[in-house]
Design a protein with these regions (language model features):
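Conserved acyl-donor/pantetheine-binding loop and adjacent beta-alpha core of acyl/acetyltransferases
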Residues: 1-41, 100, 105-113, 117, ...
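Conserved GNAT acetyl-CoA-binding A-motif
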Residues: 33-42, 62-81, 91, 138-142
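Glycine- and acidic-residue-rich phosphate-binding/metal-coordinating active-site segment common to enzymes
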Residues: 57-58, 70-111
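Short conserved beta-strand and strand-loop elements enriched in small hydrophobics
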Residues: 203-210, 246-252
Length: 252
């Protein structure tokens, strides 16, 4: 089923008789019918945050995509949580979107995951002029939640760009990228492994078992023999990835 968003665009007004033009920023309902591969939201409990765990989880999705590109649509798409203040209040919802729904935010959000048809029924089809909205709403259109900024920055570094689509409920931005243009996908290489002890593992990066049935990723030290085209890893890494000597590993 199509996904429903607001799309931010420019509406051009022109009067030939008065000889003037004016550009207006507007939001209008937008049905996203084209296929895409959507990245889900990652939530880590506070006790497990830090030490690169969040970025490892996020990057592992791109590493899986690089190993199995035929399973995905060429375009990757992600929604980012919209801005809320320190009191957990959404200006976009409180001062704009909730006027269209006889629901609280969480109920509307819950229903939208099951069936978003009610959004098309509830919101007028004409464009909304942004400069007529409350200032505090204007300032947060397409602005990520403070807790989502690390994920937003990470995605931007992986060539994801805002596409003008805005979440209907919280005003959060949507980003997209061609999977083939994601740096972690472009840099992926496969090599057979050898398990080594007492050598200088002089490189550091993502190492993956690319198997569809046993996919796993670590970020660890390794070494590479350029002449033999062989990856040297420790027994600890091999065990974590369920790899045996001669198995193929992917490095990014």
């Amino acid at each position: 089923k199509p996904s429903v968003f607001f799309k931010k665009s420019i509406s051009k007004l022109e009067s030939k008789s008065l000889n003037f033009t004016k550009d207006l920023d507007v939001l209008a309902l937008h049905l996203c019918k084209k296929p895409y591969s959507e990245l889900g939201t990652l939530f880590l409990k506070p006790a497990f945050r830090g030490k690169g765990r969040g970025s490892l989880l996020s990057f592992s999705r791109f590493i899986f995509m690089s190993a199995h590109q035929k399973r995905f649509d060429p375009t990757a798409f992600v929604e980012i949580r919209g801005f809320k203040n320190a009191k957990d209040e959404s200006y976009f919802w409180n001062s704009f979107s909730n006027t269209f729904f006889n629901l609280d935010f969480f109920k509307a959000d819950e229903i939208s995951y099951i069936d978003n048809h009610f959004i098309m029924e509830s919101i007028p089809k004409y464009p909304f002029i942004i400069e007529h909205m409350p200032r505090k709403v204007q300032r947060v259109i397409g602005k990520p939640h403070p807790n989502a900024m690390p994920a937003y920055s990470l995605l931007r570094k992986q060539n994801f760009r805002p596409n003008g689509l805005i979440d209907v409920l919280d005003g959060g931005p949507c980003l997209e990228a061609k999977i083939k243009d994601i740096p972690l996908v472009k840099s992926a290489k496969l090599f057979p492994i050898e398990i080594k002890r007492n050598i200088n593992f002089d490189r550091f990066g993502f190492i993956a078992n690319p198997s569809i049935d046993a996919f796993a990723v670590v970020k660890e030290n390794y070494a590479f023999d350029k002449d033999k085209k062989v990856l040297f890893i420790s027994a600890k890494v091999a065990k974590a990835l369920n790899l045996k000597p001669g198995s193929l590993a992917q490095v990014n």
